[in-house]
């Protein structure tokens, strides 16, 4: 019979079998007791190779996520126990003071300090839970993003089409920009939350007559109100285009895609970064325009109708 106040977790039989691929089956028991603190015990026994290999990776990932949840629950229980103990100590201290009286400013500040002390572990617990949940969701999103990227590789000019058809971006793109974007083969966005919130935009290009770079990376520090330029890969223009690039950058001082692309600190360029990170990257397909195939018996022309 388990002690009162304890939490016991058993790894399901299906997950234990999932570890056969590495030669071990794991059975996890986590027990958090209000009297004896938190204890975590992992018992592993050697088992022979069994199961279907194609399921092992998925089972292993599921086991990792389950153990993450278990550890998160253990931390929550431990922190709650500590908070209960601190509250009980504060109550005993208050009971030791003879006679309740009107609260003076000094006593009010002491009470406020005690409440703030109690609040700190709750805030820390919330931050840990949020961070762990975000990391878990990122792990689950990654295989889908990888698959999406592989599929997009089979659609020529996908990202150029998407960027040019975005309602805000379309006003910032010239014909020369569209030609440059036609050499773009992939777009990737990565976000880091710690130690600072950072958004990294990576644009991948095939060989083109404009610049030598295969990958151009732009990084932005993100806060509540804006995206602030942090770092950008220097563009290695070909000599045949370097003069033209200089002319374009200084001839037009308004915000456009080329100025954002070539000058990381160009005024207002953070707006383009925000569109790429928060809108285009999350659902690019909504801005992709497909060419409508001609109907049978009709003559084809250069002006094909677009499908949203």
From Swiss-Prot:
Signal peptide residues on this chain, from the entry's feature table: none
Gene Ontology BP annotations: cell differentiation; gonadal mesoderm development; nucleosome assembly; spermatogenesis
Keywords, ordered alphabetically: Cytoplasm, Developmental protein, Differentiation, Gonadal differentiation, Nucleus, Spermatogenesis
Cellular localisation: Cytoplasm; Nucleus
The UniProt record lists the keyword Nucleus: yes
Statement: the UniProt record of this protein carries the keyword Chaperone: no
MF (Gene Ontology): chromatin binding; histone binding
Role, per record: May be involved in sperm differentiation and proliferation.
Family: Belongs to the nucleosome assembly protein (NAP) family.
Protein name per Swiss-Prot or TrEMBL: Testis-specific Y-encoded protein 8
Organism annotation: Homo sapiens (Human)
